[in-house]
Amino acid sequence: DYQTGDNVISPLINLNLEINDNDRLIIYGKSGSGKTTLLNILSTLEIPSNGSMIFADKLIDSLSDKELSNLRLNDIGVVFQSHHLLEEFSLHENIILPGSIAHNLDKDFANFLIEKLKISNRKDHLPDQLSGGERQRCAIARALINRPKLLVMDEPTGDLDRNTSDEVMELIDDIFNEIDISVVIATHDENLKFKPNSKYLLEQGKLNLIQG
């Protein structure tokens, strides 16, 4: 909940969501439905004011800031609609940065991601030298570099045209088939090329299962 003037706003209402190992979930919702709030909670960027979140047997609101930071670095990957790449770093440097920070960089896995996402010929380019699809593929590789247990994606292809969106989703779907990871995607795009095992609709803060 948050306060706006005299009103208390509840972006999410009586929401229960369980994510199991290797789950593939998609959450549809229009702008203002609460998608971003939900994904911020799943990625521990926000702590719910009511209720609780448990991740890997850890009660999130009981963790210190340092513990939350380590959890995000090692166990939760996040991809936003905007790529948030560091403009002064090359594509390759952006991808390996979280691994370097965590002191557990797997160079072979980095090369695997770069090859799978078909950006190996662009690895030395800066973000402003890349296409929108290439920048987003870089952001996806960066989110996966530490082999997180959970990948959270907020409108991951929202800035891309249909053909580029389909291409990016096909490439990452291929990666998902080769690694152990749970994936949650929030989108308004009902034609997103993704094969979930569960589909949800988020409307006015209420989450409803529509398939799965």
Question: Where in this protein do the model-derived segments appear?
Answer:
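Short coil-to-helix segment of the ABC ATPase nucleotide-binding domain corresponding to the Q-loop/switch region
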Residues: 89-97
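Helix-to-loop junction immediately C-terminal to a conserved catalytic motif
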Residues: 43
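Conserved ABC transporter NBD signature motif
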Residues: 51-59
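Catalytic Walker B motif of ABC-type/P-loop ATPase nucleotide-binding domains
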Residues: 151-154
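Conserved ABC ATPase signature
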Residues: 126-136
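ABC-type ATPase nucleotide-binding domains, specifically the catalytic core motifs of the NBD
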Residues: 3-5, 96-107, 116
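A short, proline-enriched helix->beta-strand linker immediately N-terminal to the Walker B motif
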Residues: 145-149
